[in-house]
Curated annotation (Swiss-Prot):
Homodimer. It is an enzyme of class 1 (oxidoreductase). The keyword Magnesium applies. Its EC number is 1.1.1.262. This is Putative 4-hydroxythreonine-4-phosphate dehydrogenase 2. It comes from Rhizobium meliloti (strain 1021) (Ensifer meliloti). One of its GO terms (cellular component) is cytoplasm. Transmembrane segments: none annotated. One of its GO terms (biological process) is pyridoxine biosynthetic process. It is found in: Cytoplasm.
Length: 348
C-alpha cells in the first residue's frame, strides 16, 4: 500500500510488526484501539500478532470494530496491503487469562508474539517492531534467564552490538548511561568511555529519527552536579572529560548540568535529548512531563523497536479506560524512523 508524498510521488508505508503484550493487562484493549485509528492506517501498515480471541475481547472492552485481513506467517511480505493484517497464532484460550495478574500463560503469550515480530523484521518482512506492554515478572515465568527485553531481543536476533533504551517525548528524548542496576552500583559503572559510547549511540538514533544536528544536554550524577567537587568527584573526573571528548568529535553536547533542573533547561533551550546517569534520574522527569505520550525505543538495532513507556496497568485492565496516547506515539515514531532508515539506505 502506498501513500502520496509531499511532492505528489507515491511512497510505500512502513510495515510494522505489532506484538500483543500481556493479555492480563491493558494490552488487548490498546492493540484493538490502535488498529481502529485512521491516522495509524495512513502512517503505517501493521502486521499484528497474537490470538484473535484475545484481540476480539480487547475490541469489546474498547468498544471498537476491527477490519483486519487474516494472514499466515508464510504468506506475509513487505509490500503492505490496504488493510492491517492479523496473524492469529491461536495460542491462548481467553478462559485461561487471569486479568490483573502476572502469570506463566500471560508471559508465554506475550514473549511468543514478541519473538514472532522480531523474526519478521529480521527476515525483512517488517521495517520496524512495536509491542504493547508486557510484565517483566510474567516474562521471567516464561523465560527465567531474562531480566528485561533487551537481552531477549539480542538473543532472538543473535545480535552482539550495543542496545540501549531511550525514552522519547515529542519535545525531548532521554538517554541513560546505566539502566536496570541497583542505585548503589551506578557510580562504579560510570566511565569516560561508557558515557562517550552512549553519546555516540544517542547521536546516531536521533539522526535516524530525523534530527540532523541534535543538541544533547548531559546531567551530573551528584547533587548540584557535584558543586565543584563538594558532593562528589564524578563530574570532574568522568562526566566533564566525556563531554569534552564528544565536543571534540563534533557533537553538540553540553553539561554536566544539575539533574534537578536539566530537563527544565532542555525544554527551555531547545535540547533534543537529555543524557542521565541512571534510570530514575530521567524516568521521573519524563513521566511527569508526558506519561500518556512517552515511548520507549530500543536503539542500536538494525530496525526501529518501540513500545509505550508505561506498563500493563493491571489495576484498570478490562475497564475500557486505557489511554491510547503512548501506544499511538510508539507506532508513529517507529514509522518515522523506518522511513528515515529506508531513505538513508536508498541514498547510500
Amino acid at each position: 500500500m502506498t501513500t502520496s508524498g509531499a511532492d505528489g510521488t507515491k511512497e510505500r508505508r512502513p510495515v510494522i510488526a505489532l506484538a500483543m503484550g500481556d493479555p492480563a493487562g491493558i494490552s488487548p484493549e490498546l492493540t484493538a484501539r490502535l488498529l481502529a485509528l485512521s491516522d495509524i492506517r495512513d502512517a503505517a501498515h501493521i502486521i499484528a500478532i497474537g490470538d484473535r480471541r484475545i484481540l476480539d475481547e480487547g475490541a469489546r472492552v474498547a468498544g471498537v470494530t476491527l477490519d483486519l485481513e487474516a494472514a499466515s506467517l508464510d504468506a506475509l511480505d513487505n509490500a503492505g496491503t490496504a488493510r492491517h493484517v492479523f496473524v492469529d497464532l491461536a495460542h491462548l484460550d481467553p478462559a485461561d487469562v487471569v486479568r490483573g495478574e502476572a502469570t506463566l500463560a500471560g508471559g508465554t503469550f506475550a514473549t511468543r508474539n514478541f519473538r514472532t515480530a522480531l523474526e519478521l523484521a529480521h527476515a525483512g518482512k517488517a521495517d520496524a517492531v512495536c509491542f504493547t506492554p508486557f510484565n517483566k515478572k510474567a516474562m521471567r515465568f516464561a523465560y527465567p534467564g531474562y531480566d528485561d527485553e533487551i537481552r531477549f531481543v539480542a538473543d532472538v536476533l543473535s545480535f552482539t552490538g550495543k542496545v540501549r533504551e531511550f525514552n522519547v517525548l515529542e519535545k525531548v528524548w532521554n538517554a541513560r548511561v546505566t539502566s536496570h542496576i541497583p542505585l548503589k552500583d551506578v557510580a562504579s559503572h560510570l566511565s569516560v568511555e561508557a558515557i562517550l559510547a552512549e553519546l555516540k549511540l544517542t547521536q546516531a538514533c536521533l539522526k535516524d529519527a530525523g534530527y540532523e544536528e541534535a543538541k544533547i544536554a548531559v546531567a551530573g550524577l551528584n547533587p548540584h552536579a557535584g558543586d565543584g567537587g563538594s558532593f562528589g568527584m564524578e563530574e570532574i573526573d568522568i562526566i566533564e572529560p566525556a563531554v569534552e571528548k564528544a565536543r571534540a568529535l563534533g557533537f553538540n553536547v553540553e553539561g554536566p548540568f544539575p539533574a534537578d533542573t536539566v530537563f527544565l533547561r532542555a525544554l527551555k533551550e531547545g535540547f533534543n535529548a537529555v543524557m542521565t546517569m541512571y534510570h530514575d534520574q530521567g524516568q521521573i522527569a519524563m513521566k511527569i512531563i508526558g506519561f500518556d505520550k512517552g515511548v520507549t525505543m530500543m536503539g542500536g538495532l538494525p530496525f526501529p523497536l518501540c513500545t509505550p513507556a508505561h506498563g500493563t496497568a493491571y489495576d484498570i485492565a478490562g475497564k475500557g479506560i486505557a489511554d491510547i496516547g503512548a501506544t499511538r506515539e510508539a507506532i508513529l515514531l517507529a514509522a518515522r524512523m523506518a522511513k528515515k532508515k529506508r531513505a538513508l539506505s536508498a541514498a547510500a
